Amino acid sequence: MITKGAKAIIIGAADGSQLGTQVAAAKKSGAVVIAWDRNILNTENVDYYVAFNNFKVGQLQAQALLEGMEAKKADGPYNIELFSGSPDDANAKVFFNGAMDVLQPKIDDGTVKVVSGRTSFSETNTQGWLAQNAQSRMTDILTKSYTNTELDGVLSPNDTLARAILTATKAAGKPNPIVTGQDSETASIPLIMKGEQYSTIYKNTTEEAQAAIDLVSDLADGKKPETKEDKNNDNGKKIVPAVELTPVLVTKENAVEAYKGNDTLEELAKKG
């Protein structure tokens, strides 16, 4: 695309830490570089970032975790465990920081207790977002910390890990804890409707794609795009101006309404 004279390049990076050379070449060619869904790390050569508000995602997950536990058991304290995403994913730490913005005060005042004691991103991350890594870690935590203790809830950053966590708790003969998720994966919607997984996050990627198209259109028309400067979009070299969309928390109660317009997910929610 660079050699063909592209004026704008939209990059959806699987690993945002590996593209420094490529975006430098794009910038040198005069192209506008737009990171889509995941930020591109450790480079000055990213002009814009289009994504859902990932800090808000984490906040919503933590709020859902607390609400789910309170609905199940009115009085705390609540025993919880924390899982975060892959350290090579620029979004993972932002999700976690958003969640801890809500949970840390509850940890500090004793409302919730992380029984394993693992509360940092480095202690809770899941390399590669791999289900087997989350399942193995959950099994280890249950063996070491929950022999005679009830696990009330688990902060899971996405649906794949949520299902792995539930697999581990079932294998250990434990009741299902309140477990959060993200991405509205088709395998998790039935679990949510049955009350096994408590929540997920819906991010309408059609809206996200349209936001990137609109950004390019504004630039082509000579308009200044409406962006925000947010420290959570710091890529290690700069705070990348961002177009942020609003994520939606989904539980059993609002799933059908939340998925209106997405025929596949709406149908799964209606099936229950």
Where are these regions (language model features)?
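A residue-level marker of the well-folded mature domains of exported/periplasmic proteins
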Residues: 1-272
